[in-house]
Amino acid sequence: SVKKEEEVLTGNLQTLKIRVHEGYEEFTMVGRRATAILRKATRRLIQLIVSGRDEQSIAEAIIVAMVFSQEDCMIKAVRGDLNFVNRANQRLNPMHQLLRHFQKDAKVLFQNWGIEPIDNVMGMIGILPDMTPSTEMSLRGVRVSKMGVDEYSSTERVVVSIDRFLRVRDQRGNVLLSPEEVSETQGTEKLTITYSSSMMWEINGPESVLVNTYQWIIRNWETVKIQWSQDPTMLYNKMEFEPFQSLVPKAARGQYSGFVRTLFQQMRDVLGTFDTVQIIKLLPFAAAPPEQSRMQFSSLTVNVRGSGMRILVRGNSPVFNYNKATKRLTVLGKDAGALTEDPDEGTAGVESAVLRGFLILGKEDKRYGPALSINELSNLAKGEKANVLIGQGDVVLVMKRKRDSS
C-alpha cells in the first residue's frame, strides 16, 4: 500500500504525524482469544467482523481495528496528552501512542464512533458502544460473528506475521505495513499475535501483563516450586517476569524486591511456613534488582487501570483474589486458573499416600541431586535414593523400598 505522512490533530489539539496507508486493504487479525476481519480504505474502516471468547477480548480486537483504521473520529476521541514511553523511556510512535491510550480507556472512542441500524444476518449480531450485543443497532461498520470469521474473508489469503513493533510482514519477510518506515537492521524477529510469548503481553496493556504473568506461574507451578526452593536466583531472572516490572512504581521496585526475597528466604528457613498462594502472589515482585533495606510492607502497589492498585501481602484484594473453596485465582476479576494442589490444607494426606512405598531417611542430602516433585518419584528404581519436595516447601531424602509393603 502507498504510505504518506499526514499531520492530524487529536481531541486535545496535540499534533500527531502519522503515516497513512492509502487504498483498500483487507486484514485478518488473529489474537489468542479473538479473531477479526478488517476491511479498510484510506483512513476509513469499511467493515470489521469480529469473533471472540468474551466481551473483553472482543473489545480489545475492536480497539486495535479502530486505531489501525486511522479514522479521524478515532484521533478526535483522544482526551488528554499522549506521552507513553517504552522501558528505555523513549516515546512510542504515534500509532502505538493511540493504541496504548485507547487500551487504557476506550469509552470516548466507542461513544464517538457512531452507530447504525443493522440487517438481520444469520450468525451475526451488532455490538453497542457499551459493548453489549444488539440485534437492531451496532457500532458503525462493526459486527460480531458467533461462528468465527473464516468464511467471511475473501479467497486469496496472504499469510502475514505481526511482530512486536506492529510491523506486518509477508512470508518472505517483506514489510507490508508498519507504524514507522523500517530499516531492515531493526531485526526480523517473527512473533505472531499469540500471547504465549511474554514479550507480547504488553501489547494489550497493563491488565493483560498482570493476568498473563500469574497464569504463567500457575501453569508452570510444579517447576516454579522446585526452582523457588532450590535455585531462586535463576527463577527471579526469568524473562517472563520482565513485563511485570513496568507495572511496579519505579521508586518501589528495589524495595519491594528486597522485602519479598527476604520473606521468601524466611519461608525456606523455617519449616512449615511455605504458603503457595503467597509465593505465587509475590513472586513477580522479586524479579527486580533488590535493595537491602529494613522496610516492611503490608501491601504492594501496581499501576493498572490508570492508577495504583494494591496487592495485599497477606489476604485477598480486587487485584489478586484466591478462592479457597473453588481453588481458583482471579486477577482483576479475570480467571487466572486453578491451583492443582491445595495450598492451605497442608497436602499431608495426598503425600503420605504418594510416599507409601518410600522410606523417609531425613533431611535433604545434596549428593542426591536437585529435589524431584512427587510426580517424578515414580521413576525411581527400588533401593534408589532421591531428594523430594513435599507440599510445605520442605525437601526430604527418601529411598524407594526394596520390597513393596502390602
Swiss-Prot record:
Compartment(s) where it occurs, according to its Swiss-Prot or TrEMBL record: Virion; Host nucleus; Host mitochondrion
Any one GO CC term of the record: host cell mitochondrion
Tagged with keyword Protein biosynthesis: no
Alphabetical keyword list: Cap snatching, Eukaryotic host gene expression shutoff by virus, Eukaryotic host transcription shutoff by virus, Host gene expression shutoff by virus, Host mitochondrion, Host nucleus, Host-virus interaction, Inhibition of host innate immune response by virus, Inhibition of host MAVS by virus, Inhibition of host RLR pathway by virus, Inhibition of host RNA polymerase II by virus, mRNA capping, mRNA processing, Viral immunoevasion, Viral transcription, Virion
Domain of life: Viruses
Reported function: Plays an essential role in transcription initiation and cap-stealing mechanism, in which cellular capped pre-mRNAs are used to generate primers for viral transcription. Binds the cap of the target pre-RNA which is subsequently cleaved after 10-13 nucleotides by PA. Plays a role in the initiation of the viral genome replication and modulates the activity of the ribonucleoprotein (RNP) complex. In addition, participates in the inhibition of type I interferon induction through interaction with the host mitochondrial antiviral signaling protein MAVS.
The protein's name: Polymerase basic protein 2
Species annotation: Influenza A virus (strain A/Chicken/Hong Kong/FY150/2001 H5N1 genotype D)
Gene expressing this chain: PB2
